Amino acid sequence: MKKWMLAICLMFINEICQATDCFDLAGRDYKIDPDLLRAISWKESRYRVNAIGINPVTGYGSGLMQVDSQHFNELARYGIKPEHLTTDPCMNIYTGAYYLAIAFKKWGVTWEAVGAYNAGFRKSERQNQRRLAYASEVYRIYTGIKSSKGIRLPATKKSLPEINSVQNN
């Protein structure tokens, strides 16, 4: 029984270690702070590689970054299948970074774009509120990650700091 549990623990640790490297690699390749990707992943899945989350509007999210099923047809053109997103941590992280980079390209490197990763780009008061709530939660997680590395960021409830100034820390 102990050997069986040890094997499961080692597999889990191996997946987490691989995923950690992938946050750094995807961050480098997409010019996104890897800690921001980590914060989004924690918010989306609590770092669970095989997480599936129900989205009442578009279907469901898959894996660490909760890549939404609405993107599956586009991803299929690149050979990415839905099952890859829950079994390959690196592919999931890179895919999430890709969609965050699209949001940054569309709206600039802003917390509103981070919010759009989850709540989309539709312009309405409700969507604006959802984007702000999501971005605020990601920012809270992000500051925790930075704090654990000895980096202090402004803690604010009124407005989020400029993302470029935060990423440079």
From Swiss-Prot:
Organism superkingdom: Bacteria
Homology family: Belongs to the IagB/IpgF/P19 family.
Record carries keyword Thylakoid: no
Cysteine pairs bridged by disulfides in the record: none
Coiled-coil regions listed: none
This protein's encoding gene: X
Keyword terms, alphabetized: Plasmid
Protein name according to UniProt: X polypeptide
Keyword Oxidoreductase on entry: no
